[in-house]
């Protein structure tokens, strides 16, 4: 008799298996699980995750993430008590799919009743609890860099008191200071943290760019001066951290939660001027990277993606839109552009990643553009099935009439390969 070494279940039962005897302390958690669980499972299947890995991924969502998602959003009811930085509508949950490596990622902002009620006005408690629990689950998650940037980029108790006294009422959006992301790969998880120093900037008078660069400098990493110099030069960052071009705004630092020697640092900006020339400048570091063949090859593919998406060029005035949940963006809404650069002591130039935000664009048009780009890349299977996949994630809507399903597309190019991720609306 053969004794199986793995417990398996029919694919269609993976969600039901965990749901059957699940218990949640609140209706909000139950609703988050019932909505996000099937959605995640569909993405995992489409990304060709082995069946044996699907249940652990869902279990992590159910047990660790769902308890930190806060109030479940409902159309027509009161606005969410906490406006998250994760998505356009302030929802603290976003799924994305790295199409080259077939990696599914969940971006989220851990919340608790303390943040939603205003007791924890800058939401410091829930992210700390959640990331500590993540680190207990997987010994590859290292919090050394997380602790470093927490110390330098989060408001202190004294700064909190001052902000609440002197700057009240604080804006609805932008109060969050840290978000997390988990990726499911090779039967395990990897994690990333993102720091938004907007509140620290408001409290100290120092710009977000200066706060981020100073915190990186305090790591005292040998070899990091040159890539930081090239980044400063490209963005025209002055000593105070402000770019000479006021349309460009540093706003975010990303860091891998792994051993410090492997942890990447990512410096993020928004750009209110959306044009191909701006994209090319960011990609090439104003021409400095053109000596690298990888740069030119990636730029050529990025140009094809840009042309296929046909993003309208121009100046974007609305950096933080205030859309009511359940209401589509206005037809004339166009978001800013985003970019990040990976800073490594092992590389002379920082590696760029460009985010072409597509909220407000017709979803059918975006899907047609993506399918055409998949064909350019030789991803013929994905090209032939992509529209059906998206329809399974969002059953019901007529994509010729929606403009919010595809939040954006990110593109980078490393090791002679295009890295393309698609970001989806959580609802």
Swiss-Prot record:
Keyword Glycoprotein: no
Pfam families with a match to the protein in the record: Trp_DMAT (PF11991)
Known pathway: Mycotoxin biosynthesis
EC number: 2.5.1.110
Molecular function, one GO term: prenyltransferase activity
Origin: domain of life: Eukaryota
Ligand binding (substrate): 94
ATP-binding recorded as keyword: no
InterPro entries for this protein: Aro_prenylTrfase, Aro_prenylTrfase_DMATS, DMATS-type_fun
Listed CDD domains: PT-DMATS_CymD
NCBIfam families, alphabetized: arom_pren_DMATS
Function recorded in the entry: 12-alpha,13-alpha-dihydroxyfumitremorgin C prenyltransferase; part of the gene cluster that mediates the biosynthesis of fumitremorgins, indole alkaloids that carry not only intriguing chemical structures, but also interesting biological and pharmacological activities. The biosynthesis of fumitremorgin-type alkaloids begins by condensation of the two amino acids L-tryptophan and L-proline to brevianamide F, catalyzed by the non-ribosomal peptide synthetase ftmA.
Family designation: Belongs to the tryptophan dimethylallyltransferase family.
Name listed for the protein in its UniProt record: 12-alpha,13-alpha-dihydroxyfumitremorgin C prenyltransferase
Organism: Aspergillus fumigatus (Neosartorya fumigata)
